[in-house]
Amino acid sequence: MAKQDVIELEGTVLDTLPNAMFKVELENGHEILAHVSGKIRMNYIRILPGDKVTVEMSPYDLSRGRITYRYK
């Protein structure tokens, strides 16, 4: 996946699922499944329900994404 092809959106974490997956509600109202990016996992950043996050999505599968940033 090339960096130019990603869609970046903001959302709120609704629920924590097994295997480091999260249910995220985007600003436009859609709910997607998102996993944690490698840098967040390496730095042990905790993501809890209610956190505001930035999600990268591929234009090929708009139901899944990658959490790339957690706002403070």
Swiss-Prot record:
Superkingdom, taxonomy of origin: Bacteria
Keywords for this protein: Cytoplasm, Initiation factor, Protein biosynthesis, RNA-binding, rRNA-binding
GO cellular component: cytosol
Cell compartment(s), UniProt: Cytoplasm
SMART domains assigned: S1
Keyword Transcription applies: no
Principal cellular location given in the protein's record: cytoplasm
Molecular function per GO: ribosome binding; rRNA binding; translation initiation factor activity
Signal peptide coordinates: none
Domain S1-like, chain residue ranges per copy: 1-72
Pfam families: eIF-1a
Function text: One of the essential components for the initiation of protein synthesis. Stabilizes the binding of IF-2 and IF-3 on the 30S subunit to which N-formylmethionyl-tRNA(fMet) subsequently binds. Helps modulate mRNA selection, yielding the 30S pre-initiation complex (PIC). Upon addition of the 50S ribosomal subunit IF-1, IF-2 and IF-3 are released leaving the mature 70S translation initiation complex.
UniProt xrefs under PANTHER family: TRANSLATION INITIATION FACTOR IF-1, CHLOROPLASTIC
Family statement drawn from the similarity comment of this UniProt entry: Belongs to the IF-1 family.
Subunit structure: Component of the 30S ribosomal translation pre-initiation complex which assembles on the 30S ribosome in the order IF-2 and IF-3, IF-1 and N-formylmethionyl-tRNA(fMet); mRNA recruitment can occur at any time during PIC assembly.
UniProt name for this protein: Translation initiation factor IF-1
Record lineage: Bacteria, Bacillati, Bacillota, Bacilli, Bacillales
Gene: infA
